[in-house]
């Protein structure tokens, strides 16, 4: 499971559930919103201390660029700066080098992929969004998704933003908790 944007409720609501079920997730952090309250867009974010605690307990903390910009709309030099600046602060704050990358707005092309893939084990190029969209947020639809993965022998990467608030939040967070209990 992947969780985008470093929302405060990822620490307060989600992290305890992951611990309860023994799950590890990937948390895509864009450093500017953690460093600068004006970049938070009205959505409370985790602190660096909370991010470090999660990292120390085995959650993957990785890069979502410095400022969450659409990388297709900036120069390749700016892409490089977005990646390097965020990687540097994530390393400084967690003591771990980010090993994966998530594209803001899923905006990627072959030139961007070359830059973001350097020194990484992977980048998120495919995902299954779950959250606010009713068609993908019911217990039945989540069960069906997992069943299709098991039957086909494929991997699945769940992309989650808000839990109870914010972008694509669940209509009821219990849907996610119930899903975790089944998986």
Task: State each model region's role.
Residues 133-141:
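Substrate-binding/catalytic cleft of secreted carbohydrate-active enzymes
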Residues 21, 30, 172, 176-181:
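N-terminal structural segment of carbohydrate-active enzymes
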Residues 9, 19-113, 118-122, 126-131, ...:
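Metal-dependent polysaccharide deacetylase catalytic core of the NodB/CE4 family, i.e.
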Residues 131-133, 170-171:
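Gly/Pro-rich active-site loop or hairpin
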Residues 140-149:
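A short, acidic, amphipathic alpha-helical segment used as a generic capping/interface helix at domain edges
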Residues 13-17, 111-115, 145, 179:
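A short acidic, amphipathic alpha-helical/loop segment
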